Amino acid sequence: MSNDISVLIYSCDSYSDVWNPFFTLFFRYWNCPYQVYITTESKECEWENVITLNTTGEKWTDRIRKAVEKIPTKYVIGMCEDMFFRRPVRQEIIDYCYWEMEKNPEIVNFNFEKTLTPTEDCVYDNFSRRVCRCDYQCSCQPTLWRKDKLLELLSGSQDPWEWEMTEVSPDDYYYVWTGNEDELVFEYGYHQKWFGIQKGKWVLDDVRPLFAKEEIQVDFMKRGCV
């Protein structure tokens, strides 16, 4: 299984100051069994066991597509670099989703965020199927993707907000977490419209107590605060 899945962190040069707190918490709360990649334009991430994929493009999807093309595995867990873990990742749920995707090729992804959009009941524990043509069938939040389908969905030239509104085929299946909020697979402090960073600035009410608890030093003034 570990040879079938990779993790791709969506990032950019201007967020390189976020990498230290992100990866500190990432590896503290996840004994990740997969190869981890980060995509950015030109900088090199120096974290041990993290491979940097430098890509350029006119739009966000152009860069991410080029990065995904370089990843050799059948599945990719994608997420952004401003999602700071607060408790252990539930690896057993990721394993469960992997095996269901192996058995059912029509499944495009399992999205691990708490859904705010319409869903339909399904047979998978703690998940529901996203209603056809609803928003966020493509999501930048933690998601286990079938790589070939992810590449198809990245074929346009879009920014991340446009991409999350992409209209997808009604023949494909997209699932999202509808279990208890206190049992999320990845807990990163999501509050509907923001988490650790909002519009490029630190959300102090969120990250200051978190980083103090985790003994992570950050100069909040460099990025600014809200």
Walk through the language-model features, giving the residues of each.
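Catalytic core and acceptor-binding pocket of nucleotide-sugar-dependent glycosyltransferases
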Residues: 137-202
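Conserved donor-nucleotide/metal-binding helix-loop-beta segment in metal-dependent transferases, i.e.
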Residues: 87-118
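Short, flexible, basic/aromatic active-site loop/helix in glycosyltransferases
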Residues: 122-135
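Hydrophobic helical membrane-anchoring modules
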Residues: 193-226
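N-terminal anchoring/stem segment of glycosyltransferases
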Residues: 1-75
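Short beta-strand-to-loop acidic/aromatic patch adjacent to the donor-nucleotide binding site
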Residues: 74-84
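A structural signal for short, well-ordered beta-strand segments and their strand-loop junctions
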Residues: 37-38, 76-78, 108-113, 144, ...
